[in-house]
Amino acid sequence: MKKFTSEIGSSELILDDTKLNDVKTRLSRPEILADRIQRILNSNFVKMTFPVFNALFDGASTYYKEEISKDLKNSIIDGHVIAIDLSEPMDRIIDEDEDAEYLDDYKLMNPYILEIAREKISQGGDSVLKAFEEGFKDARLGQYIDYKMKTRPESINYENMIICYKKYRAVMGTAGRNMAFNRAPLGDIFHLGMAKAAECVGCGNEIQDALKQRSIKTPSWPLYYSLISKDVRKAFEITMKKSEIYLKEADLAVHMLPLEFQFKPFLEFLFLTVNHYNQYWYNELVRGDMLDSFQKDFNISVRR
């Protein structure tokens, strides 16, 4: 726990010592621990990435003409999925907008989740582990800026929003890179595609969050564009355009793939589903007739 504390450098993610024994006792019950794990796994990122990682890994193995053992493949993929699992409770702890009654449990679980992820990823070798550590460091920076803007809304600006999105692109981009064991050219191509696809999904998640919470998330692209334009409806429209820009950058990665790469059609289908995911939540937002309410709330908050 102390190692995790010094590494994360964020007191908000650390369990208060006075709660430690109670949380340990609670999580020692298998049914409680299983429930918390299931809640973490109930994540759009986790659901969307597992088949993608398998496709990238198999595509890279075929391209490099390698026979990779099933155990090693599972370790690399599972390790990165577990790392994404870790980003979920960390985000929930910072945002405090989901699973509020379970956040102390997540704080105790986080160091163990990270340890398991590292152990599995390290089986890919030093280069793979180094890429993961660099990506994890970037993701922590993104979460720090996210928290800074959440607690100090006056710090919301374009530059900070770009850095904040490291929490999406760093974890997913690194995972993509390591599906090719951090080797050129596929490692760089996978990194670009997964990083930008993750940022695109991030826009969709912010729209979904607005629907679930019945308020614009702080920080988020919809809030940033609302602050600039003073028009909430326009802000969500621009957020959709921002997501399309991210997706176009992700599509560049598909066009960069070598001709002999066999999984290109699957990746094209993946990006189509990402686009549909965002469009679905935007359509739900418009149908839900919440934008006028959001505008009223925004106007009141700006006048304060």
Please state what every model-predicted region is:
Residues 1-304:
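All-alpha prenyltransferase/terpene-synthase fold signal
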